[in-house]
């Protein structure tokens, strides 16, 4: 199946960062860096990569999904966006592929099934991982309008920022990648 045609004037930002403009009003997207998973004529979907929500043992997360595990590895959970808060996503390096894995750009993959969590618990998962819940979504043309209005700056995606252990510094670094250092 072919992806939908991209209308004239539409820029496909898939595989790039959306970096919140410094003047964006205080809301969930202020100071956000979003990895754009897909952007086509049907709309866009992305994941905020720098909004830490909490941390805890991987075993507790697996138990919440009904999976027995003694995994004590500490994991961090991130808010991927305000849509579908009950949905979980694992944005990871492309060295793992399971039944629910979708290959993305820039050496990244996205998994949405329990298989990736089980693989991580067994030490057979991807080398780099960002666990998120929820996502950012835009209707057709909405993201294009927000970019044209100046709400978002575009920057090349950088895996060192996606998987950074210092999410509070990611926005400022991404601004530099977008050509707008503070």
From Swiss-Prot:
It holds the Pfam family DUF179. One of its GO terms (cellular component) is cytosol. It comes from the Bacteria. Transmembrane segments: none annotated. Belongs to the UPF0301 (AlgH) family. This is UPF0301 protein MCA0413 1. It comes from Methylococcus capsulatus (strain ATCC 33009 / NCIMB 11132 / Bath).
């Amino acid at each position: 199946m072919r992806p939908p045609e991209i209308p004239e004037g539409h820029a496909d930002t898939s595989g790039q960062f959306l970096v919140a403009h410094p003047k964006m009003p205080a809301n969930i997207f202020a100071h956000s860096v979003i990895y754009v998973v897909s952007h086509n004529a049907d709309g866009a979907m992305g994941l905020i990569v720098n909004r830490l929500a909490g941390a805890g043992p991987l075993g507790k997360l697996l138990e919440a999904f009904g999976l027995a595990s003694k995994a004590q590895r500490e994991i961090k959970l991130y808010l991927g966006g305000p849509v579908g808060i009950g949905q979980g996503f694992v944005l990871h390096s492309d060295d793992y592929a399971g039944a629910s894995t979708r290959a993305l750009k820039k050496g990244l993959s996205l998994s949405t099934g329990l298989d990736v969590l089980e693989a991580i618990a067994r030490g057979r998962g991807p080398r780099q991982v960002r666990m998120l819940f929820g996502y950012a979504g835009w209707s057709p043309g909405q993201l294009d309008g927000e970019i044209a209005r100046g709400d978002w700056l575009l920057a090349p995606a950088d895996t060192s920022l996606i998987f950074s252990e210092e999410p509070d510094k990611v926005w400022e670094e991404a601004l530099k990648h977008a050509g707008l250092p503070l």
